[in-house]
Swiss-Prot record:
It comes from Polynucleobacter asymbioticus (strain DSM 18221 / CIP 109841 / QLW-P1DMWA-1) (Polynucleobacter necessarius subsp. asymbioticus). Keywords: Cytoplasm, DNA-binding, Transcription, Transcription regulation. It holds the Pfam family Transcrip_reg. Belongs to the TACO1 family. Residues 1-21 are annotated as: Disordered. GO terms for molecular function: DNA binding. This is Probable transcriptional regulatory protein Pnuc_0618. It is found in: Cytoplasm.
C-alpha cells in the first residue's frame, strides 16, 4: 500500500457517501431488516444487526426508521423478503471487484449489475473468480496520531489478528469476523475512536491505478454503488 493514503481514500469515500445520504439510508434499512430477520432483534445476540445500527447512527438515520426496519425483519411489521447475492468481476488493469446485493428480484439485479460493468469498461466474472483475492474480516481504521502502542495492546489482547501502521500514519485493526464486536468494545472502552468500523472483504494485495485508469475505475465503482440493490462494493484497486 506504499504510495497510497489509506486515510485519504477512506475520507474520500465517506464524503461521497454523505452526498448520497438518502440512498445510504435505503441500503441501511434493507441491511437492518435482513439482519433482524436472520438473527433476531436482540443486539447483544446479533452482531450483524448491531453493526448495521451503528452504521445507521453514523449516517444520522432517525431511530424511528431503525426500529421499523427491525420490526419488518422480526415480522412485527409486514416487509419485503430480500435475497443476498454476490457478483464478482473486473475493472481497469484486471482489478478485482466484489458486489454484494440485497434484492427482491434477482433477474433485475443481475441485469443492472452487468449493465454497470459493461457500460463502464468492466467485465462480470463467474462465482469465485475474484473472491479468493479478498479476506472476510472485521476492519477498523484510526486517524493518524492515534497511539499505536495503546491501540496495539488493547486490540491484540481483545482478540484482533493484526494492527497495521500505514505510510500516512493511520492505523488499521483486523479481526476475525466472530470477534469483531468484542474487539470494537474493548477499543471503545479504552477511549479510542475508530473512524471506520465494519465487516468487509479486504484485499490481500492491492493494484495501483493512476490517471485515466483510476478515473475510469472510480466511475465504474460509483455506477455499481449507485444501484438500488447494491449494498457494498469491494475492490483491490488502490486509487
Amino acid at each position: 500500500m506504499a504510495g497510497h493514503s489509506k486515510w485519504a481514500n477512506i475520507q474520500h469515500r465517506k464524503g461521497r457517501q454523505d452526498e448520497k445520504r438518502g440512498k445510504i439510508w435505503t441500503k441501511l434499512i434493507k441491511e437492518i431488516t435482513v439482519a433482524a430477520k436472520m438473527g433476531g432483534g436482540d443486539l447483544t445476540a446479533n452482531p450483524r444487526l448491531r453493526l448495521a445500527i451503528d452504521k445507521a447512527k453514523d449516517a444520522n438515520m432517525p431511530n424511528d426508521n431503525v426500529q421499523r426496519a427491525i420490526q419488518r425483519g422480526t415480522g412485527s411489521l409486514e416487509g419485503v423478503n430480500y435475497e443476498e447475492i454476490r457478483y464478482e468481476g473486473y475493472g481497469m488493469n484486471g482489478a478485482a471487484i466484489i458486489v454484494d446485493c440485497l434484492t427482491d428480484n434477482r433477474t433485475r439485479t443481475v441485469a443492472e449489475v452487468r449493465h454497470a460493468f459493461n457500460k463502464n469498461g468492466g467485465n462480470m466474472g463467474t462465482e469465485g473468480s475474484v473472491a479468493f483475492l479478498f479476506k472476510h474480516c472485521g476492519q477498523m481504521l484510526f486517524a493518524p496520531g492515534t497511539s499505536e502502542d495503546q491501540l496495539m495492546e488493547v486490540a491484540l489482547d481483545a482478540g484482533a489478528e493484526d494492527v497495521i501502521t500505514h505510510d500516512d500514519g493511520s492505523l488499521e485493526v483486523l479481526t476475525p469476523v466472530p470477534d469483531f464486536s468484542k474487539v470494537q468494545d474493548a477499543i471503545s472502552q479504552a477511549g479510542l475512536k475508530a473512524e471506520l468500523a465494519t465487516v468487509a472483504m479486504r484485499p490481500e494485495t492491492e493494484i495501483a491505478l493512476e490517471g485515466d485508469q483510476a478515473e475510469s475505475m472510480q466511475k465504474l465503482l460509483d455506477a455499481l454503488e449507485n444501484l438500488d440493490d447494491v449494498q457494498e462494493v469491494f475492490t483491490n484497486a488502490a486509487l
